[in-house]
């Protein structure tokens, strides 16, 4: 529902100026190489409709999603850039791929044959990018297992009716790891990818477009594969567009976090010594303690693992530890050190000056920033800001 108003309960502020800044930083690092902006998982929880608009305005060459539904959402929103589906598409939807000019990943001969037959029944041609598995071990033609067979299958795909091969790509498994063994593994993946490209070219099926770099790849190896192939190349950044480094080992410090998660204080009360708060009575006051209840919980994406002092929330510029267990829809913080806190005051769950960052939360909960961002649920409105002004709100409930 398009609007610029929303209920101040819990919301995610999306800084589109930061998003633009990040895109430009990646573009500069890539040396002018075309960029395929990854907007899967609703732009890592930020909202793909608005984020894709910004990327298009900034000169993105492609958009990448995970599934057909995500691609159709973008088309329905008026996005006209080429779209690549990185994952699986049921062959029965070939007509949608054709009609909406959406490119599918092709990762096995049986999948390609099924898609070919469906495309013929639909009376059109599906554009495909061949997916090479150089060591990720997910979908893709298994080059490490049997290179010659994988190439033969790719070449057979190129002859199937109803399909048009327009690209070749792969995905690095450990480009974000600086361990010597993993650095060598990334190099092996890259060389195997180049070998596959050259084999296809030698057989008369040179891919018109080639892409292999993810976020870590484009920052560490911006000349891959453009320095080694004659085809058009592009980079495929993801997490760095949203302001986060690929890993603790690979950090650049050039990006601005785009999301800030906020809520409000619903009640303030004083706990006396011996009184407790939340389920399980995991926190019992030893001294008089002022407690603020906040309008958010793990159902919104604030991890329950941040219970009992692990999470730090910002209220009036003061860091406030979480008290007791995080509930489904509410959590409590210690605001004893916060002067004049009252109901309706804003609290920053992550992304503030003294609150946790999404990366802090990832470390504390033994995960990655990607999961923290994607975990913000759909009942949390996304509030889009440009130049400090709200320009749009996406609320999936209203």
What function would you assign to each model-found segment?
Residues 2-20, 24, 69-70, 89, ...:
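Active-site anion/phosphate-binding pocket segments in diverse small-molecule metabolic enzymes
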């Amino acid at each position: 529902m398009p609007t610029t108003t929303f209920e101040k309960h819990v919301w995610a502020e999306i800084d589109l100026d930061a998003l633009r800044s990040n895109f430009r930083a990646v573009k500069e690092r890539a040396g002018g190489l075309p960029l395929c902006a990854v907007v899967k998982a609703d732009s890592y929880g930020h909202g793909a409709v608005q984020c894709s608009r910004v990327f298009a305005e900034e000169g993105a060459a492609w958009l990448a999603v995970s599934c057909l539904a995500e691609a159709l959402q973008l088309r329905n929103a008026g996005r006209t850039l080429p779209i690549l589906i990185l994952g699986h598409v049921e062959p029965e939807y070939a007509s949608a791929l054709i009609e909406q000019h959406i490119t599918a990943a092709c990762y096995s001969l049986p999948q390609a044959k099924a898609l070919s037959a469906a495309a013929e029944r639909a009376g059109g041609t599906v554009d495909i990018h061949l997916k090479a598995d150089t060591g990720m071990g997910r979908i893709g033609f298994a080059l490490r297992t049997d290179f010659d067979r994988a190439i033969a299958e790719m070449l057979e795909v190129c002859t199937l009716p109803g399909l048009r091969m327009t690209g070749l790509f792969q995905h690095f498994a450990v480009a974000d790891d600086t361990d010597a063994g993993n650095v060598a593994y990334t190099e092996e993946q890259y060389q195997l990818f180049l070998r596959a490209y050259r084999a296809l070219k030698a057989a008369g099926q040179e891919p018109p477009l080639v892409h292999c770099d993810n976020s870590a790849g484009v920052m560490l190896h911006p000349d891959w594969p453009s320095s080694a192939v004659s085809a058009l190349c592009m980079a495929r950044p993801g997490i760095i567009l949203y302001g986060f480094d690929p890993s603790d080992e690979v950090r650049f410090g050039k990006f601005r976090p785009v999301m800030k998660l906020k809520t409000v204080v619903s009640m303030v009360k004083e706990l006396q010594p011996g009184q407790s708060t939340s389920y399980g009575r995991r926190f019992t006051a030893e001294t008089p303690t002022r407690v603020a209840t906040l309008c958010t919980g793990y159902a919104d994406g604030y991890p329950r693992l941040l219970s009992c002092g692990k999470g730090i929330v910002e209220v009036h510029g003061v860091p406030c530890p979480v008290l007791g267990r995080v509930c489904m829809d509410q959590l409590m913080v210690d605001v004893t050190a916060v002067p004049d806190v009252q109901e309706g005051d804003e609290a920053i769950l992550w992304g503030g000056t003294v609150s946790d960052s999404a990366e802090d939360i990832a470390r504390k909960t033994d995960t990655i920033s990607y999961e923290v961002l994607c975990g913000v649920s759909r009942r949390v409105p996304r509030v889009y800001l440009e130049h400090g002004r709200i320009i749009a709100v996406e609320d999936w409930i209203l």
